[in-house]
Amino acid sequence: MSKVLVLKSSILAGYSQSNQLSDYLVEQWREKHSADEITVRDLAANPIPVLDGELVGALRPSDAPLTPRQQEALALSDELIAELKAHDVIVIAAPMYNFNISTQLKNYFDLVARAGVTFRYTENGPEGLVTGKKAIVITSRGGIHKDGPTDLVTPYLSTFLGFIGITDVKFVFAEGIAYGPEMAAKAQSDAKAAIDSIVAA
């Protein structure tokens, strides 16, 4: 049995293409792998606090007493990291906003990236500590950006996930959604076909 963590990060709720596609993946996964356990965390419905000067102090080893706000941030960071490490497959629904990931997803990453916990520095360079995972990224875009200089989402997510130890990453693209109903429908259809292939593997 595998455990699957689904991270939604769109601000558009049910209207979101990435949310719809991640819901489709969950449906297909349950159909093909009924014994697996699936956890869904919606980072827009339950937002993560923005990292600031006060909160970053909670995430660094220190003997200094923590403020109540820092204590809350540290407890949430511990919870998010424990959840991440407890799952085998990480599904990230990542819409492109202004060429990059959403603020909601970035805030999550900022609380998950912790030296000595999810990565460490060695004499040979940084080493990721969140290993043995597979990641599936579902990324939706209004325009066409894949393999082009305006796609900052793919390299960023590949770099971040690899940095914390997740190197088995598959991407599903839904592009051209803003180009009209026909293009949007094709984007959904192509993305669902890619999801079907991944789930069946």
From Swiss-Prot:
Its cofactor is FMN. FMN binds at S10, S16, Q17, S18, M96, Y97, N98, F99, S140, R141, G142, G143. It is an enzyme of class 1 (oxidoreductase). InterPro entries: Flavodoxin_fold, Flavoprotein-like_sf, FMN-dep_NADH:Q_OxRdtase_AzoR1, NADH:quinone_OxRdtase_FMN_depd. Quinone reductase that provides resistance to thiol-specific stress caused by electrophilic quinones. Also exhibits azoreductase activity. Catalyzes the reductive cleavage of the azo bond in aromatic azo compounds to the corresponding amines. Homodimer. This is FMN-dependent NADH:quinone oxidoreductase. It comes from Shigella dysenteriae serotype 1 (strain Sd197). The gene is azoR.
